């Protein structure tokens, strides 16, 4: 399945499958909090049943409810903006690597068989840049995915670096400059290709900015404190009316507000392994498949109007 085709369908069958889906749901993350609120509500109900009556007018919660709702909306929107910015950055990465690989394959002259092999190696380096960026964003060490794309000497050099994608970008730029010095590309082609390399590095920087600029801690703490206060005050407002149904209703309210807040937590860092993160593994695999297809095309001097 392509990474473009995993979106929910409008089919009733698919809708039901998503409704009942556990993987990717926030239920496991919020279940304990919801149960705590329900247990507290049950305690309030028991105390109320013993004759200790509570009376907090429900009208007094209207303003706090609106404020909490606005805070939750802001929290979720901010997290989704980070998620979407990460997706756009990786979309730019895909397009840039496709464009640069196409230009290199078609435009760089091949005066010798070794030059052809060098072009293949540089296309693999383009995919290696994407894979290294993925691993860098996940704080993972280099693995066999990178090993398959690089010569052993290159892999060993990257092992000792804090930012392998930057080193790979340097290698790509160095290759392009060398081809220009050998008159295999002209100045205009060199400039165009170096701009694409710059775009790849810009994407890396954008992703690092998303990763290293979390939601302010004070905001996250205050929002969670407000959510707990809201869920703990609600039983006192409804127990006289709902009695033993209080815990159930509070559970629904807690599930709603904690769930919305947890969605923001899930998607604010879109570069991990979770079901709600970007499918970076699939994106990298797609790029590699695209470049392997490109390598199967005839060399630049054999191409004639698509024949």
Curated annotation (Swiss-Prot):
It comes from the Bacteria. One of its GO terms (molecular function) is chloride channel activity. InterPro entries: Bestrophin-like (IPR021134), YneE/VCCN1/2-like (IPR044669). Signal peptide: none annotated. The keyword Cell membrane applies. It is found in: Cell membrane. It is a multi-pass membrane protein. The keyword Lipid metabolism does not apply. The chain crosses the membrane at residues 26-46, 54-74, 226-246, 247-267. One of its GO terms (cellular component) is plasma membrane. Keywords: Cell membrane, Ion transport, Membrane, Transmembrane, Transmembrane helix, Transport. Belongs to the anion channel-forming bestrophin (TC 1.A.46) family. This is Voltage-dependent anion channel-forming protein sll1024. It comes from Synechocystis sp. (strain ATCC 27184 / PCC 6803 / Kazusa).
């Amino acid at each position: 399945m392509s990474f473009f085709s995993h979106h929910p369908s409008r089919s009733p069958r698919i809708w039901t499958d998503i409704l009942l889906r556990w993987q990717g749901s926030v239920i496991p993350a919020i279940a304990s909090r919801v149960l705590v609120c329900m247990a507290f509500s049950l305690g309030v109900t028991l105390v109320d049943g013993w004759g200790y009556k509570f009376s907090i007018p429900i009208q007094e919660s209207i303003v706090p409810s609106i404020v909490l709702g606005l805070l939750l909306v802001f929290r979720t929107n901010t997290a989704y903006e980070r998620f979407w910015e990460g997706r756009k950055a990786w979309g730019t990465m895909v397009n840039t690597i496709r464009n640069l690989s196409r230009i290199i394959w078609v435009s760089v002259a091949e005066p010798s068989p070794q030059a052809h092999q060098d072009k293949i190696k540089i296309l693999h380096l383009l995919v290696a840049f994407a894979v290294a960026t993925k691993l860098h964003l996940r704080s993972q060490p280099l693995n066999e995915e990178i090993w398959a794309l690089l010569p052993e000497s290159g892999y060993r050099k990257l092992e000792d670096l804090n930012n392998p994608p930057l080193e790979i970008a340097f290698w790509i730029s160095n290759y392009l400059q060398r081809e220009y010095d050998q008159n295999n590309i002209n100045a205009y082609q060199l400039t165009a290709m170096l701009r694409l390399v710059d775009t790849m590095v810009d994407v890396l920087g954008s992703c690092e900015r998303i990763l290293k600029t979390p939601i302010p801690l004070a905001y996250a703490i205050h929002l969670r404190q407000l959510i707990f206060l809201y869920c703990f005050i609600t039983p006192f407002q409804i127990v006289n009316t709902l009695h033993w149904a209080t815990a159930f209703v509070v559970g629904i309210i807690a599930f709603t507000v904690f769930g919305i807040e947890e969605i923001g937590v899930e998607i604010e860092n879109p570069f991990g392994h979770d079901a709600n993160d970007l499918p970076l593994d699939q994106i990298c695999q797609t790029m590699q498949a695209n470049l392997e297809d490109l390598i199967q095309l005839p060399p630049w001097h054999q191409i004639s109007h698509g024949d």
